[in-house]
Amino acid sequence: MAQLEADYPGIRFVYVTGHLDGTGAAENLNLRNQQIRDYCAANNKTLFDFADIESYDPNGISNYMVLKADDHCDYDSNGDGSSDANWAANWVAANPSQELTILASTICSDCCAHSQPLNCALKGRAAWWL
């Protein structure tokens, strides 16, 4: 990336973390994602943090990554090692009149590959700010 940035000084490059894969906090994916975050922070780089978006519902209260969430928003709610809940589906069901629910159930309802429409709406909103 450094060579590309040197070759194209007028271009803003966007770094991206890897999507969640259900391995949790102590595993390789999260460790590599943290390296990307640290590098971007230390070097004033633009970061599109897929993993962070996939880790939190819109309320931002629980970190589902530590509960072994994956990019489909499934996670282990009771610590038995099995994905048995879906934070995006739960949030949408609990917030039927929220703007994000309406967006997820209309515009994003059938165009979100291997994930939940809410997750895609959150990523789209983040991309808008880039």
Regions found by a protein language model. Name each.
Residues 18-59, 72-73, 77:
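Substrate-gating cap/lid alpha-helix
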Residues 3, 34-35, 98, 116:
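Residue-identity detector for glutamine
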Residues 1, 33, 37, 124-127:
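Extracytoplasmic/secreted envelope proteins and their assembly/folding machinery
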Residues 1-8, 12, 19-25:
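Catalytic cores of nucleophile-dependent amide-cleaving enzymes
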Residues 64-65:
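Mature extracytoplasmic or otherwise solvent-exposed domains
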Residues 6-14, 42-47:
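Loop/turn elements at helix/coil->beta-strand transitions in domains of secreted/extracellular proteins
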Residues 47, 68-130:
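Histidine-centered active-site loop/cap adjacent to the catalytic His
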Residues 5, 38-39, 119-122:
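A general structural signal for short secondary-structure junctions and capping/turn motifs
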